[in-house]
Amino acid sequence: MTLAQFAMTFWHDLAAPILAGIITAAIVGWWRNRK
C-alpha cells in the first residue's frame, strides 16, 4: 500500500462518519426548528 492509498483510506474512514454526523445534525436541527 502506498502512502497515497493509505491517506485516501484514512480520509474516507475519517471523513465519511464526520460528514454523516454533520448531515444528521443539520436535519435534526431543521426538524426541531420546523415543529
From Swiss-Prot:
GO terms for cellular component: plasma membrane. The keyword Zinc-finger does not apply. It comes from Escherichia coli (strain K12). Keywords: Cell inner membrane, Cell membrane, Membrane, Toxin-antitoxin system, Transmembrane, Transmembrane helix. Induction: Expression of the proteinaceous toxin is probably controlled by an antisense sRNA, in this case rdlB. Only a few of these TA systems have been mechanistically characterized; the mechanisms used to control expression of the toxin gene are not necessarily the same. The gene is ldrB. InterPro entries: Toxin_Ldr. It comes from the Bacteria. Belongs to the Ldr toxic peptide family. This is Small toxic polypeptide LdrB. It is a single-pass membrane protein. It holds the Pfam family Ldr_toxin. It is found in: Cell inner membrane. The chain crosses the membrane at residues 10-30. Toxic component of a type I toxin-antitoxin (TA) system. Overexpression causes rapid cell killing, probably by disrupting the cell inner membrane and disruption of ATP synthesis.
